[in-house]
């Protein structure tokens, strides 16, 4: 299994319940396709650097996971057709140095915070 990280941005107009539902949906897609989720990092609602689909803000999430390579095409397909996702990025960690960084990130986040809370980002003017 390969090491991956997916960052996705949800529409800012979603309620907290809808955001949690979409997060669970993405996690379900991963687990149904044999992925092992290491860590989920909710980064909160932040201002975007530029407008995406007429939105100036978005709710960010990062998920660190291990998965077979055939899952990535399915994950991309699901994220593309999900209307609430305004942008996503999937990163594959390949060499030893990258994998060590992935492990440090995913395990460091787990150990440093028992319950991860959204980060408070300063407002950008």
Swiss-Prot record:
Q: Which CDD domains match?
A: bS6
Provide GO CC annotations from the record: cytosolic small ribosomal subunit
Q: Name one Pfam family in it.
A: Ribosomal_S6
Signal peptide extent: none
Q: Name one GO biological process term.
A: translation
Supply the alphabetized keyword list: Ribonucleoprotein, Ribosomal protein, RNA-binding, rRNA-binding
One annotated GO molecular function: small ribosomal subunit rRNA binding
Reply yes or no: does the keyword Ribosomal protein apply: yes
Its function, per the record, reads: Binds together with bS18 to 16S ribosomal RNA.
Instruction: Return the similarity comment.
Output: Belongs to the bacterial ribosomal protein bS6 family.
This protein is called Small ribosomal subunit protein bS6
Say which species the protein is native to: Campylobacter jejuni subsp. jejuni serotype O:2 (strain ATCC 700819 / NCTC 11168)
